[in-house]
Amino acid sequence: MPHTFGSRVLVLGGALAAAGALVGAQSRTGTLDPAAPPGEWRYIGGDAAHTRYLPADEITADNFEKLEIVWTWRGDNFGPQVDYVLRATAIYVDGVLYTVAGQRRTVVAIDPGTGETLWTYREPPTVRFDRGMRNNYGKGLASGEIAGRKVIYYTSPAFFLHALDARSGEHVENWGIKVPLPGFPRSGVVDMLPDLVKDWAPWLESGYKYDPNQGIPRDLGNLSTSSPPIVVNGVVVVGNVHEQGYYQTRTENIPGDILAYDARTGKYLWKFHVIPRPGEFGHDTWKNDAWIRTGDVSSWAPMSADPARGLVYVPTNPPTIDFFGGFRPGANLFGTSILALDVRTGKRVWHFQTVHHDIWNFDNPQAPVLLDVTVNGQRRPIVVETTKQGFAYTFDRITGAPIWPIEERPVAASDLPGEALSPTQPFPTRPKAFEIQELTEDNLIDFTPELRREAVETLKHYKVGPLFNPPIQVGHPSGKRSFVSCPSGASNIFGPTVADPETGVLYVATERACRAENLVPGSKMDEPDDPKTTGRTLSQWVVANRGDLRGPQGLPIWKPPYSRIVAIDMSTGEYLWEQPNGDTPARIKNHPALKGLDIPNTGQMGHAVMMTTKTLLITAPGGDPVLYAVDKRTGRRLGTVKLPAPGQYGMMGYVHQGQQHVVVQVMSPTHPGSLVALRLPRAAAGKKP
C-alpha cells in the first residue's frame, strides 16, 4: 500500500501481549510512574525520572553472551534519501514499540516481538517544516491515556503537536483545533506557534498576518522541536529548539517558551517565559532591554518529571548566538539553567543557572535524572544535571537546594570589543568534574618525546586557559590563532546519562573533546538568502572557525582515555569507578608513529550508549559494533555480543511475552539507522517452548 502525505499505513492490527513476569519488584518513589506496569518503557528515558533503567533480571552476566538478534528494523525508506542517523529512543507501551524515523520524522509503530511495522504517520508538507532544523533528531515520542484509550503524542519539526490513537495511528477525535492546511486531519492536532507568539511584542508589532503554512517570518525568528513532549499528570509539556547558536549571525529570534496542553483535549493550559518579561523574576538579568529582541533559551534536550509532586524539570540552552553576547548584557536568566515548574500552572518552583551569560555553547544537553538517595543519613529526593562542562550539578528536587555546596568562583574577563562576561561562574564542589576543563602541557599526548614536542609546539599557537576561557577574534593582539574551548559542546551530548534507582549510582558517558574557535565580524559569515537565517540585526561578532584541535601526525593532541564511563555514588558524590569506553580504535593501534609501543586502552573516540537493569550496566561503545555487559559496582566487563553496526544515542529495553529484550539504535556511514532487538533463546532463558 503506497504511503501518502498525512496518511498512515496499517500493516497489522490487534492487541499485542505485554508481560512482566520476569521483572523484579521496584521501590515506587516520587521518581517513577506508579501507573506503569513493570517491564514497560513509557518514556524515552525509561521512566519520568529519565534513569533509563529496566527492573528486569532475566539477562545476567552468566547468559549475556547467549543473546541473539531476533529482529532488525531498518530506517532506509523514511525520507528523501537514506538516513544514517537515528537519534531517537523507542518507547514500549501496552505491548507495542513506538518511535520516529528519517528526515521526515515519521511516526512508526513496531511489533516488539517480530520487528514488523504496524502503522506509520507522516505530517503533510509545509514551508515551515522545510525550514525546520534537526528534523531527524526527534529523539522519540510520548504516551498517555484518554478515558482508558492509549494515545501517542508527537511534536513535529514544523512545531505541531499531534495526538494519535496508539492502536491505529489515527488522530484522536475532538482533540485540539483544526489546522486549515491540505492533508491535515479535522482533529487531533494543535498548531503551537500562535500560542507561542500571541503575547510576544515583536510579533504583535510586526503587522504580519499569521500563515500556518509559512509559520513565523524568518526576520523574526524560527524554531522547531528536537525532543518529544513529556506527559505528566494529564498535562503535555512541550519544549523546542532553534538553529544551533554557532550558525547564527543575527541577534533576533523567538524565545523558546515552554508550553503545556491538556492531554485529554489539546486545550492550551499555560506558557512559561524563558526570557522573563517586565515584572517577572529574572527580568533584571537582561540589560539594555535585550529581552525584547533576544531569543532561543529553549529546552532542546528531553525533560523529566516527578509526577507524585507535580513537577517537571526543564534543562535550557543559551540565548541567541554562541561565543558572543555583547548585545545581551547581563546574566540572561533563564538561559543555561535547570527549571522546576509546577505542571498544573507552569509557575516556577525553583531554578538554578549553571552558566551566567553563556557564550560557550554550554547548553544543558541531558534530561535531568531523578533519584532518591541517602545523604549523610537523611533520605533525599535529588535531581542531577550532567553538563557539557563536565559537571554533575545536584539539587534537592523539591526545594532546589544544592546537595553539596556550589561555589561562585572568579573567571577570566573578556578583552573582545563589546563583550562583558560574568565575573563569576558556579562550580560544584562534588562530584568532581568528569572531564578535563583546561588543556595544559600536563594532559598533552606523551606516547613518545617527539609526539609530545609537536603537541607542545602546536599549543603555543592557541589561547588556552581554564574553564570559561574567553573567545578571541581573528587578528587578536596576542597573535594567537584561536581560543581553545575545553571541554567543548561535544563532551557528553550524544550519550545519555543513566542511573540505577535501586542503588543511587549515576553512570556518565563522556568524551574528551576540546575545540579551537575564533570570531570574525558578523558580516563575514552572514548568508541573507539562506532560508534558515533568522533575525534582522547583524551581530558584532560571530564564530568563524569551529574545528577540532589537531594533534601531531593526525593523533589526538591530548592523552587518553579518549572516552570513558564514570560511575558516581550519588549518596556521597564520590566515584565508584571510571573505565575507558570500549577498546583502542584501530587507527590508534595501527598508527605508524606508535609502532612497537605498548599503548594502554585509550577507549573509543565517541560516547558510550547505556542502559541499566537489575543485574547489569549494558553499554555500546559507539565506535565498535559490539554490546557489553558491565558490572555495575566495579566497571568490569562481563560479556560481549556482536552488533551489525555501532550503537548510537539511546538504548532501551522491555519485557514482552515473558522475555526481556534489549533494543539498540545502530548506524554507521555504510549502515542506515536501524533498531536491533536482542533476547535470549528460549533454552538459555529457561523457558519452555
Each predicted region: which residue ranges?
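N-terminal pre-domain segments of enzymes
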Residues: 25-58, 423-453, 457, 686-689
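Extracytoplasmic/lumenal domain signature
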Residues: 63-76, 107-131, 161-219, 251, ...
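Charge-patterned, long linear interaction tracts outside catalytic cores
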Residues: 259, 488-491
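Bacterial N-terminal signal peptides that target proteins for export
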Residues: 1-13
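Bacterial N-terminal signal peptides
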Residues: 11-21
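Acidic, proline/glycine-rich low-complexity intrinsically disordered segments
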Residues: 30, 36-41, 48-49, 71, ...
